[in-house]
A protein has these predicted regions:
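Conserved, single-site charged/polar hotspot
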Residues: 1-356
Length: 356
């Protein structure tokens, strides 16, 4: 009887402990399962990390090989031979240094980076075109510039002197933009570098090369540049006395009436608004000729005679052909990238990596 009671008690204890034992076993099994899963996850992450490292290594090697290829290719590019108009000396400048110095000289460093890139590609393209023309004509230099007067190209030292306390900021911004695109040029449908003309501000629409220089260029045709109307200096008025006008026109042999109000008559304008024919006394000139004779900012002008002086009101600044620099900055601020900007102004051109 005592044995039976003892067994019954033992069974009761076992029954009471059984759920606890099961729970502990279940917890242990769960812990083991979690440990196995964690170990598997660690191994997966390690394998993934190895794959990533391998991929990054291969990509880096590929980039290094590509960079070496580019360096070798660009190292074969001839430096530009630049005639310094101030000193009369010819200096050789590497392509990359020229592009950086040209952008620094020709476009405000405060402009958007995409506009600076567009200027860099334009400068490289123009210089390459000039270099090839110079080789054909057996010239001693490719083109001229006047670094001392900040025209066409400047050295880093000249930029440092000009920019002063802003040198690090401005030179750094220009250099970064040039570094990204200095190997690129704009080409025509035959893959040849275009005549990458540019100017400061258009009259609101660019002019064709044919109307300005008499030679048609497939990529230098009128393009919309309405953003230029927001540029500082878009509209300017220059007053000139009759005596000064007469002196400026003397080399043309023009005979002028006694009444100054009868001296000028605009005869014709291009579709972009630039004067293509103007009567000056008994001589007919084009707008570009009168602009150069009188030192006007643009050949899109109006003429009036008020209070004893001539008033020449101009729209834009420059010849108006090709890339408008202020227009490029305007488009950049609207979200356009440098390729879109260049292909907008150089109609039909394509931006690509330069070949040998």
């Amino acid at each position: 009887m005592k044995i039976t009671l003892a067994l019954a008690g033992l069974m009761a204890v076992c029954i009471a402990l059984f759920p606890m034992m099961c729970k502990r076993n279940a917890e242990k099994i769960l812990q083991n399962t979690q440990t196995i899963q964690q170990n598997a996850s660690v191994r997966e992450r390690q394998e993934e990390a190895k794959k990533q490292q391998t991929a990054e290594k291969e990509e880096k090697e590929s980039e290094n090989n590509a960079t070496k290829g580019k360096e070798k290719e660009s190292a074969d590019w001839k430096p530009f031979r630049i005639l310094d108009r101030s000193s009369g000396k010819i200096r050789e400048v590497s392509v990359k240094d020229y592009v950086t110095g040209a952008v620094c000289s020709e476009m405000p460093a405060t402009f958007s980076s995409e506009a600076l890139k567009a200027q860099a590609v334009s400068a490289h393209t123009w210089a390459l075109y000039c270099q090839r023309q110079a080789e054909k004509n057996a010239q001693d230099y490719d083109f001229s510039a006047d670094p001392e007067n900040w025209q066409g190209y400047v050295t880093k030292e000249q930029a440092k002197e000009r920019f002063g306390e802003y040198f690090s900021e401005y030179w750094g911004k220009v250099s970064r933009a040039a570094d990204e695109v200095w190997e690129e040029i704009a080409v025509d449908s035959d893959g040849e570098p275009i005549v990458a003309a540019y100017h400061a501000i258009s009259s609101g629409r660019t002019e064709s090369a044919e109307n300005v220089w008499g030679n048609a260029q497939s990529c230098l045709v009128p393009a919309d540049s309405s953003g230029d109307i927001h540029a500082p200096g878009y509209r300017k008025t220059k007053t000139i006395s009759p005596e000064e006008v007469k002196q400026c026109l003397s080399e043309t042999g023009a005979e002028l009436p006694e009444n100054p109000q009868e001296w000028f008559s605009i005869l014709e304008r291009s579709g972009s608004g630039y004067v293509t024919a103007v009567q000056a006394g008994n001589k007919q000139l084009n707008g570009l000729q009168l602009r150069e004779l009188l030192g006007l900012r643009s050949s899109d002008f109006e003429i009036s005679f008020e209070n004893g002086v001539f008033c020449f009101t101009t729209l834009g600044y420059g010849h108006g052909v090709g890339l408008s620099q202020y227009g490029a900055d305007y488009l950049a601020r609207q979200g356009k990238n440098y390729r879109e900007i260049l292909e907008h102004y150089y109609v039909g051109a394509t931006v690509q990596k330069r070949r040998l």
